């Protein structure tokens, strides 16, 4: 009687899980491509882990919290590691809708990949498109980064304006002193005329030096 029950269950499972069956998915793994010399052999233990990960994913779907490992069926396993699987509903003895299984796999694809040290390219659910991992939120909000950059630009601009003002003031203060130095040099300039040192022109007084007056000009009274 037990043997009859076993064969009956096996026949039902074989009918539910077969290539191209309704709600069945094909999986292909490229373990050696991903891991090279560290590749592991695909055996019944790895199959058990796969069933556990699928059951784990299904338990996160509403109203599927009772899914067990035994509800996940594998068939047509090949040495190049490809197989088909379905998830059954034991209460009604049929497979769960493909939409529910697909949604569960997509939500937990990264967890399944990590369990086998693979990625979306080396662990493929052929009828389930791979999804990108959700973007990680930065530890610092974007608006704070933008505000910091703008604040730094403003500080640098203010510093440049202050330094420019100081430089211009120093330049203005330096110009009068240079003019005074030029006048002093002109006052102290001495020329030699016929062997007699004399000032050619009194710059500040505005009168002609006596050394340049002719003999008649000296004798003629003003």
From Swiss-Prot:
It comes from the Eukaryota. Residues 163-222 are cytoplasmic. Keywords: Cell membrane, Glycoprotein, Membrane, Phosphoprotein, Signal, Transmembrane, Transmembrane helix. InterPro entries: Collectrin (IPR042944), Collectrin_dom (IPR031588). The record marks 125-126 as: Cleavage by BACE2. Residues 15-141 are extracellular. The cleavage site containing the double Phe-Phe motif acts as negative regulator of shedding by BACE2. Plays an important role in amino acid transport by acting as binding partner of amino acid transporters SLC6A18 and SLC6A19, regulating their trafficking on the cell surface and their amino acid transporter activity. May also play a role in trafficking of amino acid transporters SLC3A1 and SLC7A9 to the renal cortical cell membrane. Regulator of SNARE complex function. Stimulator of beta cell replication. This is Collectrin. It comes from Homo sapiens (Human). The gene is CLTRN.
């Amino acid at each position: 009687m037990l043997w009859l029950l076993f064969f009956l269950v096996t026949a039902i499972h074989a009918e539910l899980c077969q290539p191209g069956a309704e709600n069945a998915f094909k999986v292909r793994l490229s373990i050696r491509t991903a891991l090279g010399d560290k590749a592991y052999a695909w055996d019944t233990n790895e199959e058990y882990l796969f069933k556990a990960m699928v059951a784990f994913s299904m338990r996160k779907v509403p109203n599927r919290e009772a899914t067990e490992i035994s509800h996940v069926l594998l068939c047509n396993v090949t040495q190049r590691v490809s197989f088909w699987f379905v998830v059954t509903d034991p209460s009604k003895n049929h497979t769960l809708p493909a939409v529910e299984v697909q949604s569960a796999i997509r939500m937990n694809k990264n967890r399944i990949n990590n369990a086998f040290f693979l990625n979306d390219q080396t662990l493929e659910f052929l009828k389930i498109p791979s999804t990108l991992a959700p973007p990680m939120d930065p530890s610092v909000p974007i608006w704070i980064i933008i505000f910091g950059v703008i604040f730094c630009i403003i500080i640098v601009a203010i510093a440049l304006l202050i330094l420019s003002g100081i430089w211009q003031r120093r330049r203005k203060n330096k110009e009068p002193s240079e003019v005074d130095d030029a006048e002093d040099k002109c006052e102290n300039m001495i020329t030699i005329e016929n062997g007699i040192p004399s000032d050619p022109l009194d710059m500040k007084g505005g009168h002609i030096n006596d050394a340049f007056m002719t003999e008649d000009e000296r004798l003629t009274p003003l």
